[in-house]
UniProtKB/Swiss-Prot annotation:
This is Putative F-box protein At3g21120. It comes from Arabidopsis thaliana. Residues 1-43 form the F-box domain. NCBIfam families: F_box_assoc_1. PROSITE patterns: FBOX (PS50181).
Amino acid sequence: MHLPEDLVLEILSKVPAVSLARFRSTCRRWNALVVDGSFAKKHYAYGPRQYPIVIMLIEFRVYLVSIDLHGINNNNGAPSAKLTGQFSLKDPLSNSSEEVDIRNAFHCDGLLLCCTKDRRLVVWNPCSGETKWIQPRNSYKESDLYALGYDNRSSSYKILRMHPVGNPFHIESEVYDFASHSWRSVGVTTDFHIQTNESYGMNVKGTTYWFALSKDWWSSDDRRFLLSFDFSRERFQCLPLPADVKNLHLTVVLSVTREEQQLCMFATLGAGNVYKLDVFVATKTEETTGELTWTKFRRFHSKICINVSADHEKKVLVPHHILLPYYNILHIVGEDIYIRQVNKDGDIGCPILLTYVPSLVQIQQGI
């Protein structure tokens, strides 16, 4: 049965973006519609509300993770989590169907900025399959730090690349602008070092945040602070941590709430195998200064140290972006501690978890 194209468009526009990603491989006609710019706009306007999902980077591949929280909500037991699918990124340099080895990934508005194992850089929409390979001015380095953000003034996506030179406090930064399709330098900084073991960068409404260490960390009472980069102004800013987050906190992690996209901070403090987890939410951002107003949301007591993201409505914490060497354990925290293993055969290496909002947003490709 051959349906009229306008009816097919109407039906597909109401299908969740992550489901459309699966349909693309089953029908060439549907695939052509999904990658069309006019359909992307229609889906954004009339499609179902997109909620964040959890994706996991295991053995250089991106997997979808399904988290069942019914056990918490109904008091029927522990929640569960399992791998339910995979986003595949084909290597354009391969003559076969070989996939790209993804070493790290960063999320913004449904797009993933991926660093490959062989030091290439690609922006990828897993739902539409669209990609854009970003060429360097010289070459990419393994020590490079990246962030993907959006310039609200020019309505264009941008990539920030930070390259430490000589020592971790001497950082050369440059921005790739999707509007001009070129790199340009944004200067050199010598005042801070981004702590990559704690912070991979969290993008909230056009600004990316990290935890950073001041240059005089050995003599300063405020040696750790929040570093932000505004993609519209293309500038860094140093922001203070909440008053309750002292330097003696063992680990500080950033995340973002589901509904209102508010920045969250998780600070752990512990001795032995018992930890306290303090959750802070940025309730206000000063437009002129960029400073944040923090509210302490809750404190949890745990026997493990974890990185999580918040679901305020269900009072549940779900992991956001966490490095777990040698383990594939997914932690879900509610009123108590629950642990369930994500089943996958073989050696998983070092998995990375992050929340992802499915979208059909298009990538500016250039001429």
